[in-house]
Structure formats: C-alpha cells, structure tokens
C-alpha cells in the first residue's frame, strides 16, 4: 500500500470543487490541475493510451500481462468535490489508533462524535483521516482516485495476472455532468466499476431514478393598501405549492428504497418566485407518478390566475436506476462479491440513495456498479475516511482484476 495515504493527502490539497449552472466542462479550473497531475503520474507509471479530452475525461490502459481471451475491465472515479461545502484549503487531521469518543475537528467547537455518527463505534483501533471542521475532506471521491492509482501501482509492480485494465477519471460528477462526455467506445472496457461508495463492503448496483423540477411563478405586486383583488403574491403561491407536496415523502423522513420530493431552493418576491425540487425514486412507475404529481400541483395552484400571472414548471430527467442494465450481466456482481470475500470482507448489497457516473454509463452501454472507498459523511465538515478502508478497497480492485483474468484463461 505504498504511497496510498500520501497520494490521498496530495489530491485533497487541491481545490477541485465543481460548480453547478456552468456550461463549460469541467466547471472549474481546479479540476484541470488534478487531471493533469494524474495524467503525469499515469505516464510515469508506464500506462499506455493515455488521453485527456477537452471535456476533462482522463483515460489510460494498463496492458494485460497474460495471454488469453480476457475481457478488458475498467475502474472509474471522479476528481471533483461537492459544491455543497467548501473544498478550499483542506487541512486533514490524521487520528491514529482511534480509541473512541469525540474527535475535535480543528481548534473550534466542532467535533466528530459517535453520538451523531454511531459508525465510529465500529472503527476502534483504525486510522481516521478527518477534516479540521472548516471544509469537507474530499474523500468523495479522491479516496477512490487514490485507491485506483495505488491498485495500478500494485498490479504494475507485482506478478499478479490481469487482462487489460482501463481507468478513467471524470470531472463534474457532483453536478451531474461527469458521464455526459464519456466516450464508452474509446474507453474499451466490457464492464467497469466506479470506486465512489462508502463504508467497507458496500457494493451498489441500484440507484435512484432522478429528475429536477424548476418552477417559475409570476405574480403581480401593488401597494398592499390597495391590493384587494389585484395583488397576486408569488411567494404565497410558492407556499401553497409546497404545502401540497407530501410532507412525509421528504429526504428527512425516508430511507432504504423509499423515494422523495426535496425542495432544494426557493427564492423570490411578491412579484416573482422560483422553486427548485429534486425528485427521486427507485421504482420507475413511482418515479413517473411523482413527476405527474408535481404537474398536478402546479395546475391546481395556478387555476384561475390572471392571464398575466402564471406558474411555469419544467421537469428534466437526470439519470435512471442502473439496476435494469447491470442485472443483465450478473457475473459483474459475482466477481466483485467473490473479490470481497477473498479479501475477508462481507459484501453489503445496498441501494444508492443518490447517483453515480456509473448510473449514466450503464445506460450508455457500459454496465458499471459501484465499489466502496472506506469514506463516510460525504459533502460536509464531518466527512472522514479510514486508512484501513482505503487499503481494503485497493485489495478488492486488485483481486477483481485477478479473478477476471482467471475467467478468461
């Protein structure tokens, strides 16, 4: 596991936060810095067919070291970090041999507590890498990046049989654009794994169907003293819309396979208001029903408005549940599960209450379930990763490569 932690700490030192609402891909210059660094490291490692596209997708190949009809497989991670929390001047803390209890994050009042995050009870004796309470850590997904790079080094430096190993590093995954410019044909893998999961053992092949809902409300503002019968308050209409959305079907009230409506932002004045929702559901029929529900609500609240006042609703699908594509190729999951068991890890098949690049790639002809990274509490100041979890991820990647080679020989 030479240089695994060193690589990770180097990668998180670079601010690669992506930005939503930007046309260019990658959306931020910082992502280019990490992509160019990785390209240089791949070249130094001796990989071939290294390309960095104008849209920031970095691809490379570790050639097979054995003969046979061995399928080419891929491993993919994203270089950007979430726009939800600052990724600038990340200052990681290394807690060796965690003994339990609260971990102070920096010099302020912030702590990482097992009361709020009970998973810490399972990590006694391990080495934790945390934030200083001022930024996110960036384990999502620089842990995955470091693990893939380290696995390549292990495969390159040891006589472990493997076929062609394709790797890719993508930008803007956190803003939903990571896979849009991914050339599956150029990548050349029969299947792949994103390394973008959470705790040790996670193996995910089901994710939400996802859509965004943007609502524009145009009202009419006049002096409140003479407003009767004339004023149309856009903010009041927004409140009425949200009151119609099922309150018990929100992120904070759902879990497992339950879907939700999430009001992500709302702004406005009496004259004009905007609302942004996201819709999520694992079941395609329920997903379509949720979209219809939003349209019905907008129609109901907007009924009888003055012609100059209106509610405009735009729904855009973001990605779909990759399950229907991955289950067509059960050996992809079988190999990953066997690799975990061979590394003394119990596979934990669970749905992703979110999405990955792999969801989009699966519908582009590259079946792509998701492997764990050893990270927790993504997108915020309580994010952390365990060194042991990262080492396990490297072992699983290497073992997947070895098992795939055995199938083809």
Swiss-Prot record:
Q: How is the cofactor bound?
A: Binds 2 Zn(2+) ions per subunit.
Q: Which cofactor does it need?
A: Zn(2+)
Q: Where is the active site?
A: 80, 173 (proton acceptor)
Q: Name one Pfam family in it.
A: Peptidase_M20
The protein's predominant localisation is cytoplasm
Does the entry annotate any disulfide bonds, and if so which pairs? none
Q: What residue ranges carry the coiled-coil annotation? A: none
| Compartment list | Cytoplasm
GO molecular function terms listed in the Swiss-Prot or TrEMBL record: metallopeptidase activity; tripeptide aminopeptidase activity; zinc ion binding
Q: What is its EC number?
A: 3.4.11.4
Q: Name one GO biological process term.
A: proteolysis
Looking up PANTHER family in the UniProt record yields: PEPTIDASE T (PTHR42994:SF1)
Q: What is this protein called?
A: Peptidase T
Q: Which organism is it from?
A: Salmonella dublin (strain CT_02021853)
